[in-house]
Regions:
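Surface-exposed amphipathic alpha-helices with a cationic face
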Residues: 74-77, 137-146, 190-197
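A conserved hydrophobic secondary-structure block that centers on an alpha-helix together
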Residues: 50-84
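Active-site-proximal helices and loops of the catalytic beta/alpha 8
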Residues: 106, 113, 167-169, 173-245
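Aromatic- and acidic-residue-enriched carbohydrate-binding clefts of CAZyme catalytic domains
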Residues: 58-65, 96-149, 156-177
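Hydrophobic faces of well-ordered beta-strands that scaffold small-molecule active sites
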Residues: 43-45, 84-86, 150-152, 180, ...
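Carboxylate/His-rich catalytic cores and anion/metal-binding grooves
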Residues: 76-107
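The feature marks proteins involved in alpha-glucan
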Residues: 1-44, 54-57
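Conserved, mostly hydrophobic/aromatic
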Residues: 47, 76, 86, 118, ...
């Protein structure tokens, strides 16, 4: 699988051919201070890597990047947050297609698309071209040094359960990710429970009880984000939100 992508360095721009490239970089995790936070104590902050610091008010050196987010970790810690839930931070194609070809004005900002290279950190989130893996690792190390955890959100589409498990293991081992949110109905709970890597992480999903979940298992975390979604819509003045509130 492609672990680094070239040709998508500039977010929202079509830049010609997309190619896989070699990645021989090592990373020094010395001094990481990695601690696992119990699920019951997690205070999650869901964020988009680019959107979190892209506005000039963020006052970071490299807005809209992994490095930019690293600069704001102390701000998040002051809020009381101890776990980051990152919306897709792997490489996805944000340039959307329509029936007549490519509409350059349409951008899939959030990254929930099947047109993705799941094993490659997003090139468009790197401050320096070709450094996306290193900058992502640096971000994770800084998060852990703050006593916080990181959960990645994956939108797997039309891939096998084996692919999903392999992908999550890769990020857990190479990037020290603490957990994942994913469409868990595609994977056997027993596989997850017996996995030598994933069984030690936090796995977020909806309706684990329908997948064979048994109460009291620390690794399985139930997503309950209805208030989050309704509150956001209410603040945007969307119609019909008072009743939902």
């Amino acid at each position: 699988y492609a672990r680094m992508i070239t040709g998508r360095e500039y977010f929202g721009r079509r830049q010609g051919k997309v190619r896989a490239c070699f990645d021989f970089q090592d990373f020094d995790w010395t001094g990481e201070n990695w601690k696992k936070i119990p699920a019951r104590d997690m205070i999650l902050y869901q964020c988009h890597v680019r959107g979190f610091t892209k506005h000039k008010s963020s006052n970071v050196k490299n807005p809209g990047t992994f490095s930019g987010m690293e600069e704001k970790l102390s701000y998040l810690k002051d809020l009381g947050v101890n776990t980051l839930l990152l919306m897709p931070a792997y490489d996805f194609n944000e340039c959307m297609h329509d029936e007549n070809g490519v509409d350059l004005k349409k951008v899939n900002y959030w990254g929930y698309t099947e047109d993705a290279f799941y094993f490659a950190p997003k090139a468009g989130y790197a401050a320096k071209k070709g450094e996306q893996a290193k900058e992502f690792q640096k971000l994770i190390k800084a998060v852990h040094s703050q006593g916080m955890n990181v959960v990645m959100d994956f939108y797997f589409k039309d891939v096998s359960p084996e692919f999903m498990l392999t992908c999550m293991r890769y990020y857990a081992l190479r990037f020290h990710i603490d957990g994942f949110r994913f469409n868990q109905e595609c994977v056997s709970v027993e596989w997850l429970r017996q996995d030598p890597v994933l069984s030690h992480l936090k796995l977020f999903g909806y309706h684990w009880d329908e997948c064979g979940y048994e109460a009291g298992q620390e690794m399985f975390c139930e997503m309950n984000d209805r208030f989050l979604v309704t509150a956001r819509r209410f603040l945007k003045s969307d119609e019909g939100q008072v009743e939902d509130f």
